[in-house]
């Protein structure tokens, strides 16, 4: 996973791509403007509603990417962060890490206990199958 600065750069690049694509679609689908009595043929092949759909699509993409950029910027450490604040934050993270490690150890212990029970049950099943088979073989053999 990339660090936050790389994610931020990727989001800014994505936003720039979306702006370029939106401008390209507007140039392609938009009606021509009239300049000083110059007559041009209007391309009527393009339906008007597709232009609106493109506008809505690009507006949604640009808004979502801008929101992602805001979230990434907010997650960056601030310049006002003092050494004491950073130490407190680090201490809190270490506590959370310790709690998660304790929880993980408990889950692993319970998993090991379940594994032992399953292995014991499988061994019992295998033993009973062996006894059943050996009992059937001894009964099917004729006595001499």
From Swiss-Prot:
InterPro entries: Med7/Med21-like, Mediator_Med21
Subcellular location: Nucleus
Domain of life from the UniProt record: Eukaryota
Endpoints of the signal sequence: none
GO cellular component entries: mediator complex
One Gene Ontology term from the biological process aspect of the record: regulation of transcription by RNA polymerase II
Gene Ontology molecular function: transcription coregulator activity
Keywords associated with the record: Activator, Nucleus, Transcription, Transcription regulation
Chief subcellular location: nucleus
Keyword Cell membrane found: no
Family: Belongs to the Mediator complex subunit 21 family.
Subunit and partners: Component of the Mediator complex, which is composed of MED1, MED4, MED6, MED7, MED8, MED9, MED10, MED11, MED12, MED13, MED13L, MED14, MED15, MED16, MED17, MED18, MED19, MED20, MED21, MED22, MED23, MED24, MED25, MED26, MED27, MED29, MED30, MED31, CCNC, CDK8 and CDC2L6/CDK11. The MED12, MED13, CCNC and CDK8 subunits form a distinct module termed the CDK8 module. Mediator containing the CDK8 module is less active than Mediator lacking this module in supporting transcriptional activation.
Role, per record: Component of the Mediator complex, a coactivator involved in the regulated transcription of nearly all RNA polymerase II-dependent genes. Mediator functions as a bridge to convey information from gene-specific regulatory proteins to the basal RNA polymerase II transcription machinery. Mediator is recruited to promoters by direct interactions with regulatory proteins and serves as a scaffold for the assembly of a functional preinitiation complex with RNA polymerase II and the general transcription factors.
Name of the protein in question: Mediator of RNA polymerase II transcription subunit 21
Organism of derivation: Pongo abelii
């Amino acid at each position: 996973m990339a660090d936050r600065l790389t994610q931020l750069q990727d989001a800014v690049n994505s936003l720039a791509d979306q702006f370029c694509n939106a401008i390209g679609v507007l140039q392609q689908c938009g009606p021509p403007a009239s300049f000083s009595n110059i007559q041009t043929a209007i391309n009527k092949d393009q339906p008007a509603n597709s232009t609106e759909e493109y506008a809505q699509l690009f507006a949604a993409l640009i808004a979502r990417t801008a929101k992602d950029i805001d979230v990434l910027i907010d997650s960056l450490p601030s310049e006002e962060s003092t050494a004491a604040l950073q130490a407190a934050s680090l201490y809190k993270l270490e506590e959370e890490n310790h709690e998660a490690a304790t929880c993980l150890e408990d889950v692993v212990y319970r998993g090991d206990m379940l594994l032992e029970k399953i292995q014991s049950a499988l061994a019992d099943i295998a033993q009973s199958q062996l006894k059943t088979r050996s009992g059937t073989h001894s009964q099917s053999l004729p006595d001499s």
